[in-house]
């Protein structure tokens, strides 16, 4: 523990937050992470509107975050790849990264739990997994996540409680493994799971609090376009994998 009573191990883990058109929830998220004990927080502006610039300025000036920026919106997949490359080149001594959403859905204590799991199991992909049976989960989120989870399980033979979680922890070795993964937007995270399965990388789940603010209205997941992208990943996997055929 540090002198302030915060876990000293958190200084070895970088938190990465991709953000598009943020509001004050980004500031609240960063402040809570600072209070939890994280010292290195990296925020990427993925081509946000000009009027959100003051939020990013405050994240840097008031919270001491490092800022990266895409001049145009490239999507979450590209944001993650940009961050992985930056971290690998800039922080070669770090233990790894925990990715966090900018909309306030991930509690600092759960981010810390994923960081601890990352340090304890550096060869594993760490997933912070929500419980969709809890009350307060929007119906569309409950249905969509259950369906995606079942399709993923059928195709890959791998049970993952929360395939779409943005709270993930990975070591430098895993960042390097995931850099070539295809996908520019939310489908990239699904491809990460498939890549982990292909490489026989362990996936460890950390139960986290299920938080939906204003029924998830601030999410940038497009129910139509991003769902098509995610299920296109499944279609490609179906065509290329003999494991599925063997189970039919």
Segment roles from a protein language model:
Residues 1-10, 31, 181-248:
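Hydrophobic helical membrane-anchoring modules
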Residues 25-28, 50-59:
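Acidic helix N-cap motif at the loop->helix transition within catalytic regions
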Residues 45-54, 104:
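A conserved acidic beta->alpha catalytic loop
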Residues 21-35:
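Short, well-formed alpha-helical segments that are part of the catalytic scaffolds
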Residues 91-105:
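Short beta-strand-to-loop acidic/aromatic patch adjacent to the donor-nucleotide binding site
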Residues 21, 46-50, 74, 83:
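Conserved short acidic donor-positioning loop in nucleotide-sugar-dependent glycosyltransferases
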Residues 10-14, 34-43, 65, 95:
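Short loop->beta transition adjacent to catalytic acidic/histidine clusters or analogous donor-positioning motifs
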């Amino acid at each position: 523990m540090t002198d302030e009573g915060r876990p000293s191990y958190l200084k070895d883990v970088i938190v990465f937050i991709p953000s598009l058109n943020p509001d004050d929830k980004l500031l609240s998220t960063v402040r809570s992470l600072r209070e939890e004990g994280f010292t290195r927080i990296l925020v990427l502006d993925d081509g946000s509107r000009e009027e959100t610039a003051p939020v990013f300025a405050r994240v840097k000036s008031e919270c001491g975050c490092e800022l990266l920026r895409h001049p145009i919106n490239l999507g979450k997949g590209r944001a993650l790849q940009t961050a992985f490359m930056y971290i690998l080149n800039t922080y070669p001594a770090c233990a790894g990264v925990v990715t966090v959403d900018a909309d306030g859905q991930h509690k600092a204590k759960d981010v810390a739990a994923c960081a601890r799991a990352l340090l304890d199991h550096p060869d594993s992909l760490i997933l912070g997994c929500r419980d969709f049976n809890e009350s307060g989960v929007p119906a569309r989120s409950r249905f969509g996540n259950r369906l995606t989870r079942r399709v993923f399980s059928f195709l890959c033979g791998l049970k993952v409680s929360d395939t779409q979680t943005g709270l993930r922890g990975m070591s430098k070795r895993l960042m390097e493994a995931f850099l070539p993964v295809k996908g520019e937007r939310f489908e990239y995270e699904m491809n990460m799971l498939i890549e982990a399965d292909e490489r026989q990388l362990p996936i460890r789940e950390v139960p986290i609090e299920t938080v939906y603010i204003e029924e998830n209205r601030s999410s940038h997941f497009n129910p139509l376009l991003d769902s098509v992208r995610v299920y296109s990943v499944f279609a490609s996997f179906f065509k290329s994998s003999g494991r599925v055929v063997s189970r039919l």
